[in-house]
UniProtKB/Swiss-Prot annotation:
Pfam families: Ribonuclease_P (PF00825). The gene is rnpA. This is Ribonuclease P protein component. It catalyses: Endonucleolytic cleavage of RNA, removing 5'-extranucleotides from tRNA precursor. The keyword RNA-binding applies. Belongs to the RnpA family. It is an enzyme of class 3 (hydrolase). It comes from the Bacteria. Keywords: Endonuclease, Hydrolase, Nuclease, RNA-binding, tRNA processing. GO terms for biological process: tRNA 3'-end processing; tRNA 5'-leader removal.
C-alpha cells in the first residue's frame, strides 16, 4: 500500500530552496495559478506555496487555497517526477470554488509530468 503522508522532507522550507526553482523553472499555468518546477536530485518531489495577500485578500481564502494545493500534491506525490515545485497563486484564484481549483491543479500536475518526460 502506498503511503500518502506529507512529511517535512516533501516541503520547500528555506529561501534557497525557492531560489533554486525560480532560477530555471519549467512553467505550467492557468490565468489563476502557475506551477514552477525544476528537477532535483533527491528522488522525490517537494512543494512550496506562495499565496500573496496582494492577490488573495482574505486569510481564510489564502488558507483554503494552500490546504487544497497541499492535498492535491499529497495525493499525487507518487505519480510526480522528482522535482521541486513552487505553486504561485495569482489574482482571481480566490474566485475558483474547491472543485474548479482541484481540477486546475490536476491539469497542471499532468502537464508537469509530460514536461518532465519530454526533457
Amino acid at each position: 500500500m502506498v503511503k500518502l503522508a506529507f512529511p517535512r522532507e516533501l516541503r520547500l522550507l528555506t529561501p534557497a530552496h525557492f531560489t533554486f526553482v525560480f532560477q530555471q523553472p519549467q512553467r505550467a499555468g492557468t490565468p489563476q495559478i502557475t506551477i514552477l518546477g525544476r528537477l532535483n536530485s533527491l528522488g522525490h518531489p517537494r512543494i512550496g506555496l506562495t499565496v500573496a495577500k496582494k492577490n488573495v485578500r482574505r486569510a481564510h481564502e489564502r488558507n483554503r487555497i494552500k490546504r487544497l494545493t497541499r492535498e492535491s500534491f499529497r495525493l499525487r506525490q507518487h505519480e510526480l517526477p522528482a522535482m521541486d515545485f513552487v505553486v504561485v497563486a495569482k489574482k482571481g484564484v480566490a474566485d475558483l470554488d474547491n472543485r474548479a481549483l482541484s481540477e486546475a491543479l490536476e491539469k497542471l500536475w499532468r502537464r508537469h509530468c509530460r514536461l518532465a518526460r519530454g526533457s
